[in-house]
Regions:
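Acidic, glycine-anchored loop motifs typical of Ca2+
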Residues: 53-62
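Sec-dependent signal peptide hydrophobic core
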Residues: 7-12
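Mature soluble binding/inhibitory domains
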Residues: 61-63, 67, 73-76, 178-184
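Generic short beta-strand segments
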Residues: 41-50, 120, 124, 151-162
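Bacterial Sec-dependent N-terminal signal peptides
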Residues: 4-5, 16-44, 178-186
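Contiguous, well-ordered beta-strand patches that form the walls/edges
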Residues: 48, 71-151, 179
């Protein structure tokens, strides 16, 4: 009888310790995901090409990519991005001449390319870290820079005004800094 009690006590202690371990891992996972999940907007963007560019057609070329992009008078309104437990999507801005296909006048507009990200939580002992991948866009470089902040570097192709109603395509690297605007629960 005493032996059965001891065995039951040992089994009970083992069950409690196993359930505590799972709760502890869940807490680590949640804390890691809290650093990244949410709704984001672009805070700044830098053109990393050899020469400054003029996306908005004002005649002033700049390396301030995001300011140039915002200066384009037409195009998408919502350029926010959203990250959650398993990943999310990040909108990368670029410019495009919508009339180039049919030979119409230059009409450069703002566009975004949505890139999908996968987030994985790696638990190693008492530490948790996040790993990020972009299965459809292997050229994306992602850096988690702080709580609710990250940068993305990607090569983009943009249309730039070339003066007198002409345009040309330019391809180069851009680095964008994103900042969380609102926390997202899931």
């Amino acid at each position: 009888m005493i032996m059965k009690r001891n065995i039951l006590l040992i089994i009970s202690i083992m069950m409690v310790s196993m359930s505590c371990e799972k709760i502890w891992e869940a807490d680590l996972r949640e804390k890691a995901l809290d650093t990244i999940r949410g709704y984001y907007e672009i805070e700044s963007g830098v053109w990393n090409g050899n020469e400054p560019i003029d996306l908005d057609g004002d005649g002033i070329a700049s390396f301030d990519y995001y300011k140039e992009w915002l200066g384009i008078p037409v195009g998408v309104g919502d350029h926010g991005s959203s990250l959650s437990n398993g990943g999310g999507s990040i909108n990368i801005p670029y410019s495009m001449d919508g009339n180039a296909d049919w030979g119409g006048p230059v009409n450069i507009s703002r566009r975004v390319e949505r890139v999908n990200m996968v987030t994985e939580v790696i638990i190693d002992g008492k530490e948790a870290r996040l790993e990020f991948s972009f299965p459809d866009n292997p050229d994306v470089e992602f850096e988690h820079t702080g709580y609710g902040e990250f940068t993305v570097s990607k090569t983009v192709t943009c249309t730039v005004a070339n003066g007198e109603g002409a345009s040309r395509q330019i391809t180069g690297p851009v680095t964008l800094k994103f900042k969380r605007t609102r926390y997202k629960t899931e």
